[in-house]
Regions:
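Intrinsically disordered, low-complexity terminal tails of fungal membrane proteins
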Residues: 1-59
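A cross-kingdom feature marking solvent-exposed beta-strand/loop segments within repeated
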Residues: 226-243, 351, 386-416, 556-561, ...
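N-terminal edge beta-strand
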Residues: 170-193, 342-356, 540-573
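Aromatic/His-enriched, Gly/Pro-containing loop or helix-boundary segments
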Residues: 182-192, 222-256, 261, 282-285, ...
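Acidic-aromatic/histidine active-site loop/patch
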Residues: 291-362, 368-371, 508, 517-518
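Asparagine-centered strand-capping/turn motif at beta-strand->loop junctions
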Residues: 203-207, 367-371, 576-581
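Extended terminal and domain-junction accessory segments
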Residues: 46-49, 53-152, 264, 268-311, ...
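Short tyrosine-centred short linear motifs in exposed loops/low-complexity segments
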Residues: 194-197, 241, 248-255, 360-361, ...
Length: 683
């Protein structure tokens, strides 16, 4: 087992009963009892701050607790009665209503391609259980190949997942290292659903450290408290505690992912893909395709992120980000154990990933950069492809043959298997090493997978592909993909901006300082026991109300460590992000998509007064600009995004370079703070 078991999380090792906003309660759901299910214990938010008029954070007094105890007692008695009565008489069959009992719904992706959708009548709840005993293992990522029989037009259902988070030792590339696993496997399971479905994820934390789960790119409209950001919307899930995430997927479709949002734990293994289908998916994707699959690329470290963070955040560290050891594709890589003397290593079960694609068809590949630091350049030898989706936004197809993708970004491409030179081709995923400021003698910057054409005459693979690399020079700069030609299929003209906000991102280094990242004059520190959301809800009205529609709240928050931009009403805001650092920053906004209005690699960015003129002079587009949730601002460059702040809650804007966000390059947007009835008298 991992040496993690001997380590204490000194920052957030509090148990649930010690945390003010995580409490345990027993679910005695009558429906579950009638279905023969045993009531389970889970941790939920106690009166979570549902962003509605009636919702506010409360803490029950003694009378409330007594009433709750009596209610739970009565529900338990009634539930037991229902359980006894639910057993059918001897020799009888279950009725149609019983056919979808709790036990019958416990299916895995492999058991049912439609994930529980069988017959004309759809179950109201689909359960996903994985019981993987024994040693930790690499996930069978065949589940990342999406089923062509998935019903995109089915009625909304509830999809309930059961995840056990635990520590374990695993060797994704041959080299063993401590990891954080979901259901004893790495990477995490695919979450696949339709727009309108309800997602429930029951998390049981058996790891030695606290954690959380963030569903990256999901709007969480009405469920801000399910955003999973430790220090902003929730306390971490303490060891030996449970927490249930529950939200409705609405107003979006496409490719997303989930990951830990506490410290740098995502790079320890706590991540996986999310695919949301729309009933209009085949219309929004203007090129048809025969198959559909997820391909996650990520940088991989053989040391734990706790060790790496200690070195990165040391005094006088000069912001030297930890350099990865090698890349992974869908959680797999290949290293030669002879290069790792003194390490526990076994590469006998490692192999290059193989993607079998039927010849003569189009195929959709959903690329996700799930890494901490490295930009990737991805190509398939001799195959151009069309980009058709960017961060969940369907776009008119545009041809490319190399894809630059930074951490947290997602792209769908359509590739046509119509090349006749051979049957096997390299899929190359290279880390752009120009971004690395230090040397790693064990660095392997490229990973290769094999794209294999399959047909009735396909023979076993006996040798590596001999395909040809693209001839032009490889980009060495850390630059975002040029997306100026990509325009959404669903045409949308951004509304005029109400406000203009200027942000400066930089690092304070030198003079034996800690390597801290800043937005303007603020460097963020996560408050694990008193998240920003709850501090705002508990603040007095004079500290949390606004006199103007938009302002920095420096009354309820210490702006030195909590840069909170607060709005009243729905506001459309231009945010000008100016990067004073030499490295690229992929900035991600929670809870929203933004319009990418302008970008520049030199000179001063336009101001509110000069933006329209700048767009006219530089052929800028404000008719139907790209909408996404993660934009890269290159070194000493700038970008202007326009965002409609109409999703009530507290949302982070941060660099998705893990090391930079952990150094403090985080700010928060407090949206529509006046509509929630916060300041009603508390019990």
């Amino acid at each position: 087992m991992s040496s993690r078991e001997d380590v204490e999380d000194v920052e957030t090792g509090e148990r649930a009963e010690e945390q003010p906003f995580l409490t345990r309660e027993t679910e005695g759901d009558g429906e579950a009892s009638e279905a023969g299910a045993t009531p389970s214990t889970s941790t939920r938010l106690n009166n979570p701050p549902a962003w509605s008029e009636k919702s506010r954070a409360r803490r029950p007094h003694g009378l409330c607790k007594l009433s709750l105890f009596i209610l739970l007692f009565l529900v338990t008695i009634l539930g037991l009665s229902g359980l006894i009565l639910s057993f059918p008489p001897k020799g009888t069959r279950n009725s149609d209503n019983d056919a979808h009992s709790h036990g019958d719904q416990e299916k895995t992706h492999q058991d049912d391609p439609n994930h529980g959708h069988t017959g004309d009548e759809k179950p109201s709840i689909v359960h996903y259980h994985e019981d993987i005993p024994g040693l930790p293992r690499l996930r069978d990522t065949s589940e990342y190949v999406l089923s062509p029989s998935w019903d995109r037009s089915s009625a909304p259902v509830t999809r309930e997942y059961h995840w056990t988070i635990a520590d374990g030792e695993l060797n994704p590339d041959g080299v063993y290292r401590p990891m954080i696993l979901i259901n004893n496997q790495f990477p995490g399971p695919l979450v696949e659903c339709n727009e309108g479905d309800t997602i429930i994820v029951q998390v049981e934390n058996k790891a030695v450290n606290a954690t959380s789960i963030h569903f990256h790119g999901l709007f969480q409209n009405g469920t801000n408290f399910m955003d999973g950001t430790v220090g902003v919307t929730q306390c971490p899930i303490a060891p030996n505690s449970n927490f249930t995430y529950e939200f409705v997927v609405q107003g979006q479709s496409g490719t997303y992912w989930y990951h830990a949002h506490h410290s740098a734990q995502a790079s320890d293994g706590l991540l996986g893909p999310v695919v949301i289908h729309s009933k209009d998916e085949l219309t929004l994707q203007e090129l048809d395709y025969a198959t559909d699959r997820v391909i996650m690329v990520q940088d991989h470290y053989h040391n734990t992120t706790a060790e790496l963070l200690m070195g990165y955040l040391r005094p006088d560290g000069e912001n030297d980000e930890p350099v990865p050891d090698n890349p992974l594709i869908n959680g797999r890589g290949v290293r030669n154990c002879n290069d790792f003397k003194g390490w526990r290593c076994d590469s006998s079960n490692t192999s290059k990933p193989i993607f079998d694609l039927t010849a003569g068809q189009r195929h959709r590949l959903r690329f996700i950069n799930a890494g901490a630091f490295a930009e990737f350049q991805i190509q398939i030898d001799e195959h151009p492809f069309y980009i058709t989706e960017v961060d969940g936004t369907d776009v008119h197809p545009e041809p490319f043959h190399r894809l630059n993708i930074l951490p947290a970004q997602r792209y769908s491409v359509i590739v046509d298997t119509n090349i006749t030179t051979t049957d096997t081709y390299w899929l190359r995923a290279r880390m752009v090493t120009h971004c690395f400021t230090t040397k790693n003698n064990r660095l392997q910057p490229e990973i290769r997978g094999i794209v294999r054409y399959i047909s009735p005459n396909t023979k076993p693979l006996t040798s590596d592909p001999q395909s040809k690399e693209w001839s032009e020079a490889i980009e060495v700069q850390c630059r975002d993909l040029n997306t100026s030609a990509l325009h959404p299929v669903q045409h949308m003209k951004p509304p005029p901006a109400d406000d203009f906000v200027t942000l400066r991102s930089n690092f304070m280094i030198g003079d034996w300082r800690l390597a801290r990242g800043f937005f303007n004059e603020s460097t963020w520190h996560a408050n694990a026991t008193h998240p920003s959301l709850y501090r705002f809800l508990d603040a007095k009205p004079e500290l949390s109300s606004l006199e103007t529609p938009l302002a920095i709240n420096d009354k309820a928050f210490d702006k030195e460590h909590d840069f909170v931009l607060q709005t009243k009403g729905i506001r459309t805001v231009d945010i000008s992000i100016n990067n004073f650092d030499d490295g690229a920053h992929p900035f991600h906004l929670h809870g929203h998509k933004f319009f990418l209005v302008a970008q520049g690699r030199s000179g001063y960015p336009p101001t509110a007064a000069t933006l329209d003129k700048y767009l006219q002079e530089h052929s800028g587009i404000l008719d139907n600009p790209l909408r996404r949730d993660t934009v890269t601002v290159e070194g000493y460059s700038w970008a202007i995004v326009r965002v409609v702040l109409d999703n009530p809650g507290l949302w982070t804007l941060h660099c998705h370079n893990t090391w930079h966000s952990e150094s403090g390059m985080v700010m928060q947007l407090l949206v529509q703070s006046e509509v929630h009835g916060y300041h009603q008298e508390r019990d």
